[in-house]
Amino acid sequence: MHDELEKAGRHLLMVNDHLSEDSVEQGDICMTQVPTMFSDDEDQDEEQETEIPPEEGDDDILISTQVQGAIDELNHQETVVHTFRNVLSRFALETQDQADIPLVSSKKVPVKKVIKSSKVKQPTARLQKRIKSITQFNTDNWESNRVKDRAQKMISILSGKSAKVKKLVSKLDSEASADAESLQDSHPTQFAPFNESEWQHIVGLLREKLPKVSRSELNSVQQYVYGADEQHNLWKASQLSPEKQISSQCSDGESETILPSLTLDNNAPVYTLSQLVEGESSNNRCSTEDGLRFKPISNPSSVIEQELPISIDVPSSETDVPSQIADSCDSGSIISFEELSFMIQDKNKADVDYDIPCYLPPDSKTLPTGEKTKREYSRANINDQLINISQTSYDVVSSIVSPMKAQRTGTIQVPATRTTTFQDQQQQNQQQASKPANVVKIYVDSNRDSNDVFASVKGEVDTQEQESLSTLTTSMLHDDNNEIVIDSEDERGSYSIMEVHDAPQTHLGQFPSLRKSQSQKLKTPVSATDSLDSQLQPALLTTQNASPNTAKLRRSFKVIGLKPCKNKVQMLQVWETLESKFPGSSDEDRSIQLKQFLTDLIVQNRDESALLMEQIYTFEPIRYEQLKEWLVSLNSFTELIDDSFIKNWADLNGIVFRNDTENPLLSQSQSQSQSRLLSQSLSQLQSPSLSP
């Protein structure tokens, strides 16, 4: 399309030039004849000439159809462009007139690529416009936020558009300031805060309006609410003892009103929790300051009905007398109390606790007749037993029957394990002439020897307490009412019920000697289906006619802290020596005595080895073999003590050991020497040198 327009434009130029020149011959048809300069003579002769009538003008010139069509197209294009420009002229921004397009097309010039020099931009700190954390924003802009108004800050935080909120708040502030200026001009204020004269006026009005109360009434209310301590504040008044509180003096001379319900009884005994728990201690002394003595109580059963007045004495920090409360490092008043008459007993006599229910309750006919007051009172008030806190403390006991120690006959407890244990007797001071035959049933393994069962029982019975368990008679019974509880079907039939009878006491002379008696074994196991007559056996075991059990001795050695022996003969020799040196009621007591024996052994012979004692006192690590050799040299009985027991005792006394593994030959020789010393000590167990 563009090429055609250019062609039509060239034709028009040629026609215009031909018409404007005078040399153009008349009769020639424009644009149909070849110009003279372009034509040859031969061509001019051959061409047919067309004559144009002279009477026709320029408008009557005939133009070819193609040229006329091109001209029409150009005119139409100009019309369209002119119309488009008229439309654009109606808008605010007028388009500039475009430059005339040259008719001759310009040559295409190759575009040169301009290579711009790349400049390295310096990194600039990027402004963080978006608030990610309110805490971080407040931390970074705390100075500017301090100046801002609180309402403006809160709205900006909630809305998130600080610019919009700032504009709104500034507009409101300007309106408020304008209103304030207008009000200030119209009604100027003289006193923003109250001055002294205004306060006096307000106080006078309040005194006129409020009801008038006398000073004595105010003091009585003050005393009723806070106590008679006007010069102290509430905290100081709460720390003062009742007898140290000083009544406030009335400024107007009027007497104060003391309410009778606030008076304290200074003669009432005061007990602390530590005094009640400790039982017998140095704190349980009579108060000599008050001189108060309680009267004996004739009827003990009326003690529960009486209410003892107890006033709590708060220890005061102003007193110089130290506190008598145990384990207390604070200073305070002495807290003492009076012992009641039924609580006061002879200190030399052993403490006797109340009778409580046990596994085998004794018959009422055989109850002892001594100490009728306590026992009758305890039985009369079986539901409300009064705990004698002045004689007994809250000790931890092994029995689950009662939290207090009880005076009762020897019984066999049935714990959760299969091993039977014997209940130790404590505080047994009086021997009873006779005891009823009591029976207890226990579940035992049918495959276990009955001698092993009673060997553990007999070993714990003291020879001086024969009234607790005189003779044991065993028989295997089957109780249909009490079914044996087993864990699985495989264990069914492997348990039997053993019935133990507590026979009447026999004289000590009737028991045969331990060495002369021959050991007899029970017929075990006995099936539960045998007849009752065939199951009953005579009295075979006593407390003196059976040798100690080997398993029991091994357990005792382990509890006490002795080394295990190879055979029973050595174990019996060690046991006899141990009983002669450390007489005790239980293995735990002998273990404590053995620790004390080691401590006394070192303290008494500390001058013989000054270097070793210096190392011990300065917490210098020593070799265990060195300490063991020293102990053996002092007393050969220490060779029988287990090494773990000695190390535990040394750890409790601050003796530090070190591991010496540098010389294995030396340790081997030491072990050999220790074995030789052990054999020598076993051979010399019954020598006079080992006597206590």
From Swiss-Prot:
Give the GO biological process terms.
DNA recombination; DNA repair; DNA replication
Main subcellular location: nucleus
Q: Keywords assigned by UniProt?
A: DNA damage, DNA recombination, DNA repair, Nucleus, Phosphoprotein
Annotated region (Disordered), positions in chain? 39-59
One Pfam family hit = Slx4
KW Isomerase (keyword) present: no
What domain of life does the UniProt record list for this protein's source? Eukaryota
Which InterPro entries does the UniProt entry name for this protein?
Slx4_ascomycetes (IPR027784), Structure-sp_endonuc_su_Slx4 (IPR018574)
Q: Does the keyword Phosphoprotein apply?
A: yes
Tell me a GO cellular component. Slx1-Slx4 complex
- One Gene Ontology term of the molecular function aspect: 5'-flap endonuclease activity
Q: Where in the cell is it found?
A: Nucleus
Q: How does it assemble?
A: Forms a heterodimer with SLX1.
Its function? Answer: Regulatory subunit of the SLX1-SLX4 structure-specific endonuclease that resolves DNA secondary structures generated during DNA repair and recombination. Has endonuclease activity towards branched DNA substrates, introducing single-strand cuts in duplex DNA close to junctions with ss-DNA.
Family under the similarity heading: Belongs to the SLX4 family.
Q: What name does UniProt use for this protein?
A: Structure-specific endonuclease subunit SLX4
